Amino acid sequence: MEALFPLRRLILLCVLPGVLIFGWLKWRDLSAQRQPREDSVPTINKQPVAFANRTFDPAAPPADMPPLASGENAECESNFLSNASVGGESRQSDATHATVTITHIKVTLQLNITIWVPTGVTQHVIEHEEGHRQVSEFYYQTAGKLAERIAATYMGKQIEITATDLGAESTKMLQQTATDITDEYNKELNPGPTQLLYDAITDHGRNEVVVRDAVAAAIENIAIE
């Protein structure tokens, strides 16, 4: 009765391949006139939580169900998704050098939760997995503010690039910036330790600790640490 939280399932990173880039032909003319507005802020699109309850036959689990840990018969799968698009303006100094200023960032966030329980499972097991769901949703409550804070540190940032193909190098740089933003979001979100502590408090659902109390204690103790 353990939630599975390896990073490959806990946090899935999605970076939009087509980052927002203003027209290369316009960069040379407009960059000298345009400066990023001081009040420019990143755009955060936080999607509602997508939740599903799935029941399975232990003798024939569905192909899309993550493997159960040894000794466990149910699990809560939480996927925190993030993708970022980054746009900028370039000021070209010569044929192989330019300065790119980041002027636009949009981050889209999503949380998908699936609780997997076997047919005929007890209510106690279901309640334990619901506790894992509550922990994930607690972290997602402030995910928008976290993403905004991280993205804001990149707004207006100027990056020097050197290449024979400045357009391609600019695209590569903006894509890397998008990756950096989502990587930092994933690192700081980090609900894993709280999920592990919740399992420790409840002995993976084997004891009689009230789920609500266990969730609160796990969140509080991790926050103190």
Feature-to-residue mapping (PLM):
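Active-site alpha-helix of zinc metalloproteases
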Residues: G120-H124, R133
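Extended assembly-interface/linker segments at domain junctions
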Residues: N112-V117, V125
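Catalytic Zn2+-binding segment of zinc metalloproteases
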Residues: E130-E148
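Metalloprotease/metallohydrolase-associated module, dominated by Zn2+-dependent proteases
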Residues: R37-V107, Y154-E225
